[in-house]
Amino acid sequence: MVAKILDGKQIAKDYRQGLQDQVEALKEKGFTPKLSVILVGNDGASQSYVRSKKKAAEKIGMISEIVHLEETATEEEVLNELNRLNNDDSVSGILVQVPLPKQVSEQKILEAINPEKDVDGFHPINIGKLYIDEQTFVPCTPLGIMEILKHADIDLEAKNAVVIGRSHIVGQPVSKLLLQKNASVTILHSRSKDMASYLKDADVIVSAVGKPSLVTKDVVKEGAVIIDVGNTPDENGKLKGDVDYDAVKEIAGAITPVPGGVGPLTITMVLNNTLLAEKMRRGIDS
């Protein structure tokens, strides 16, 4: 068996076309979604990622801006900028690029974002809504993972799903989304014992820990669906996933590549949530 390759680039392209159509429809009603991104410092990877978000937003007809603060910016300065965006009626969604410099509390900043503009879905109110099944902003990578599974017609009902990693960004929220689809979910982490026994029984594996080749062919059940969120650069700068891709694709039923799998959907879901934010504040049904 050779796995079906779940091409995130193509899935994202198709999804963004649908978003673009919705943006155009909103514009006809006099509303244009706007994404504001706060970037603190000069980290190269963060700058590149922020530019990608801005470009993607503008490509589908949104307005986007980067609010760039110096590496030495104080927590108060970041909060002041954030409050300005919170109170700016032209801004639909706000995103704060992390990591932040050590003098700025990431948690304090994320909690200061207006929950109705929190397109990353990291505000405690939005996290809480997710866990009681209320409409909210879902973190973008988990939302992208679910779109990949949906696009590939993966039936999750009563399936055994194993999530490796328990972060608030990916592991925990994607576990909740899988539960909503009636999968039986197991979360593995650094303290888990005998991980192989869980993986061998998994119909779906989502790995999001940043450990290259953690998931090997010998622990994957034939026909399993593999979602690889890992993106660790090797010594040559090439991105490596958590999964031994070349070996595992020979036995899996479907698999995401790295790069080109989950990554494109993460940015796409930032756009999705920005559109949702604009619709919600204008009282327009999604």
UniProtKB/Swiss-Prot annotation:
InterPro entries: Aminoacid_DH-like_N_sf, NAD(P)-bd_dom_sf, THF_DH/CycHdrlase, THF_DH/CycHdrlase_cat_dom, THF_DH/CycHdrlase_NAD-bd_dom. NADP(+) binds at residues 165-167, 190. Keywords: Amino-acid biosynthesis, Histidine biosynthesis, Hydrolase, Methionine biosynthesis, Multifunctional enzyme, NADP, One-carbon metabolism, Oxidoreductase, Purine biosynthesis. It comes from the Bacteria. Gene3D superfamilies: Leucine Dehydrogenase, chain A, domain 1 (3.40.50.10860), NAD(P)-binding Rossmann-like Domain (3.40.50.720). Homodimer. Catalyzes the oxidation of 5,10-methylenetetrahydrofolate to 5,10-methenyltetrahydrofolate and then the hydrolysis of 5,10-methenyltetrahydrofolate to 10-formyltetrahydrofolate. Belongs to the tetrahydrofolate dehydrogenase/cyclohydrolase family. This is Bifunctional protein FolD. The lineage of its organism: Bacteria, Bacillati, Bacillota, Bacilli, Bacillales.
